[in-house]
Regions:
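Short beta-strand segments of immunoglobulin-like
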Residues: 21-28, 40-41, 145-147
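Extracellular beta-strand/loop-rich beta-sandwich domains predominantly from IgSF
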Residues: 23-26, 72-110, 119-121
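N-terminal V-set
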Residues: 42-84
Length: 148
């Protein structure tokens, strides 16, 4: 009864939670990957925006922006051409989940990926991003050719 009352007066509210596919993911160069991301418990509009960034192993503290559902100028220069060419994109699925697609995976795509949902909530409460690791592997045929 007390919880219902507190909820009615706005004291108790849903807590935003962003979740991604658990990693690490292991993929070979040239493959197509998809990484799932979802937000729940948001107080804003039913359709949320998503932004994907990567933290590269060579500079793990530096965020490199990849793609966004709300800002076409979001990607850093190293990703702009692939985003505009449709090689990297976000697919919305029913409801709030989205899929980050990277076609023709490159060695430089390995790193820690972060899915972020900009706040649409009245109060900043909960998790607004989640991270996972992608480990790139060379194709076996490429490795064998170099050894020969």
């Amino acid at each position: 009864m007390l919880c219902v009352f507190l909820s009615l007066v706005g004291v108790v509210s849903a807590q935003r939670q962003v979740t991604v596919k658990e990693g690490p993911l292991y993929r070979t160069e040239g493959s197509h990957i998809t990484i799932w991301c979802n937000v729940s418990g948001s107080q804003g509009p039913p359709e949320q925006n998503f932004q994907w960034s990567i933290y590269l192993p060579s500079s793990p503290e530096r965020e490199v922006q990849i793609v966004s559902t709300m800002d076409s100028s979001f990607p850093y220069a190293i990703y702009t051409q692939r985003v505009r060419g449709g090689k990297i994109f976000i697919e919305r699925v029913q409801g709030n989940p989205t899929l980050l697609h990277i076609t023709d995976l490159q060695a430089r795509d390995a790193g820690e990926y972060e899915c972020h949902t900009p706040s649409t909530d009245k109060q900043y409460f909960g998790s607004y991003s989640a991270k996972m690791n992608l480990v790139g592997k060379e194709k076996l045929s490429s490795r064998c050719q170099r050894l020969a």
